Design a protein with these regions (language model features):
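Ser/Thr-centric signal marking residues that sit
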Residues: 289, 412, 436
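Membrane-interfacial helix-loop segments of redox and metal-homeostasis proteins
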Residues: 1-355, 360-363, 368-372, 376
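Short glycine-rich, basic-tinged beta-strand/loop micro-motifs
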Residues: 417-429
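Conserved short-loop catalytic and cofactor-binding motifs
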Residues: 207, 400, 426
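Residue-level detector of conserved catalytic or cofactor/ligand-binding positions
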Residues: 430-436
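An N-terminal amphipathic alpha-helical segment
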Residues: 381-420
């Protein structure tokens, strides 16, 4: 559970969302976030190659079932757009208090359990009958995994350095806030997630579970344990995912970001459909964006890389169908100054010189519950003014509280692209104080 809690903290503070990373490539033409995902794979690959070479672990390589992996990956990619996040993202967003993610998580675990050991297991097994027997690229070529791990790590380091150099050359705006409320750089988060993945394998193997990080099977086991009470389902993997929930809750609570947010009926239905699709797709593909995307890819297995390719395709189709960016309102007037805190942005007080907007995030004051009808953030949500509002003196505020990944990132990136040089954008996602230029 300690490894899971650490993962939950890092993912929550780093906003580590594979759905958003893939979506950015297609909608924003941005690969910066995806590099963080490659960093996870690179660190993981080096670490697992080292542990295998030293005889600390003995990975059991999965054989490649093309139809199941391709179809499952595509379904999973579509589903994580509807659910508002990938498997690990849904776990850590649940820890932030997002009720829509709770729905997605529940049906993700139930559908995965049905696919693995329930009434859908026959369907799952049937699609996996076509099995090539192929395992990994290194085994096919008869070479060490180091021949893949080192070049991949070097290429990732080179690309990351290029992005960091570009970022360093741009003017920055800093926020005066305590260290525990500051976000974690995605590249730092990626490196830590990779290290935790390396640590996870020997710890898991010591309990008899010869595997590393994983979300789908542990989620299925957790639901099976809850419904049957059988102790065999309570294992290292189930404690891992519970730890993610605990860690993300602690991180969100300390940073002032935890808040119960309740989606409307339509959004809830989408989250449920997305959760079911995640469980079905991940079970067919043999893993999610963690099991396939972070573990199997680092072993350079056919299953891992083909699954990720079809997950990306599913995200591309889903993003084109359901996601819509919005940004700064062109020609917005600049009124008097003032800064919202997170609490103020929820209750929507009127700023001096700024007209209040109609918000879909409403707070029940007695119970600290927020009703967010745009929880998943799909294009078909009811119309609202999601543009950044002027605060005066070249500052704007964008209210994203109540939206699930990846919608806040879409709005923020679009808004930033429309700012003039020297202007500032404040996101009402966390408790912040007066921003300062640097």
């Amino acid at each position: 559970m300690a490894v899971g809690a650490a993962l939950g903290i890092v993912m929550q503070r780093g906003r580590f969302c594979v759905t958003g990373m893939l979506r950015d490539v297609f909608l924003q033409k941005q690969g910066r976030g995806l590099v963080a995902f490659f960093i996870v794979i690179a660190v993981h690959a080096i670490g697992l190659a080292a542990l295998t070479s030293l005889g600390v672990i003995s990975p059991e390589y999965r054989t490649f079932a093309p139809l199941a992996v391709a179809l499952g990956g595509f379904i999973f990619g579509l589903a994580i757009i509807l659910a508002g996040g990938c498997a690990s993202g849904t776990w850590y967003r649940s820890g932030e208090g997002l009720v829509g993610s709770w729905f997605a998580l529940l049906f993700y675990g139930l559908s995965a359990a049905a696919m693995k050991s329930g009434f859908l297991s026959g369907f799952n097994d049937k699609l996996k009958e076509w099995d090539t027997g192929w395992t990994t690229l290194p085994q096919t070529l008869g070479v060490s995994a180091w021949w893949f791990a080192i070049p991949f790590a070097l290429a990732t380091a080179f690309i990351a350095q290029r992005y960091l150099a570009r970022d360093a050359a741009k003017p920055k705006v800093t926020l005066e806030q305590p260290w525990y409320r500051k976000p974690l750089h995605p590249y730092t988060a990626g490196a830590v997630v990779g290290l935790l993945g390396v640590l996870a394998w020997p710890l898991s193997a010591a309990t008899g579970r010869n595997d590393g990080l994983g979300i789908t099977t542990p989620s299925a086991h957790l639901m099976s344990y809850i419904t049957t009470g059988e102790g065999r389902f309570l294992n290292w993997g189930t404690l891992l995912v519970l730890g993610i929930l605990v860690g993300s809750y602690i991180a969100a609570k300390v940073a002032g970001e935890f808040r119960i947010r309740v989606p409307d009926g339509r959004t809830s239905v989408r989250a449920i459909i997305g959760g079911i699709g995640m469980g079905v797709g991940a079970s067919l593909a043999g893993g999610c964006t963690v099991g396939n995307g972070m573990v199997q890819t680092s072993l350079f297995s056919y299953q891992g890389w083909v699954a990720m390719a079809f997950i990306a395709l599913g995200v591309f189709v889903g993003a084109k169908l359901w996601l819509k960016p919005s940004g700064v309102k062109q020609g917005a007037a600049k009124g008097a100054g003032g800064v919202y805190t997170t609490d103020e942005s929820i209750s929507e007080p009127q700023l001096a010189g700024v007209e209040p907007r109609q918000s879909e995030v409403e707070e029940a004051p007695k119970f600290n519950i927020v009703s967010a009808s745009s929880g998943v953030g799909l294009k078909t949500k009811p119309k609202q003014d999601t543009t950044a509002r002027p605060l005066g003196e070249g500052r704007y505020i964008l209210d994203t509280l109540g939206d699930v990944c990846p919608f806040p990132l879409i709005e923020a990136k679009q808004a930033m692209s429309e700012l003039n040089s020297g202007e500032e954008l404040i996101l009402s996602l966390i408790h912040i104080s007066e921003p300062t230029r640097r």
